């Protein structure tokens, strides 16, 4: 189980957070990934036996989708925010629910394709 957690955490390190972006956005984006994906998936793989292999294709797809969703979240916080001042906490709060929902959907998809049994 420990090797599964290590593999999963290594995968999460591949998610690209642009550190030049505003800290309020970065904190929110990272917390979303942690709470909606990393913690639930880590708890799940802790229960796996050693004869279970994590699907690299599935994990790669998760990283790609998370990076896409983060960009949409950033757009909602910045240039696509029309109802409030761009880069404001109001824009961030307006964009956050759809970001968290999208991460939850990615978690569901990832849970379905996460494992393959070793023969």
From Swiss-Prot:
Q: According to its UniProt record, where is this protein located?
A: Secreted
How is the protein's activity regulated, according to its record? The activity is increased in the presence of host properdin (CFP).
| Record carries keyword Cell membrane | no
Q: Which InterPro entries match?
A: ALL3/gSG7_salivary-like_helix
One GO CC term on file: extracellular region
Keywords on record: Complement system impairing toxin, Disulfide bond, Secreted, Toxin
Any one Gene Ontology MF annotation carried by this entry is:
toxin activity
Residue pairs linked by disulfide bridges in the UniProt entry = 58-113, 81-91
Tell me the domain of life.
Eukaryota
Explain the purpose of this protein.
Salivary protein that inhibits the alternative pathway of complement system activation in the host while having no inhibitory effect on the classical pathway. Inhibits activity of activated host C3-convertase complex C3bBb (C3-CFB). Enhances accumulation of C3bBb on immobilized properdin.
- The name of this protein is gSG7 salivary protein
Species annotation? Anopheles freeborni (Western malaria mosquito)
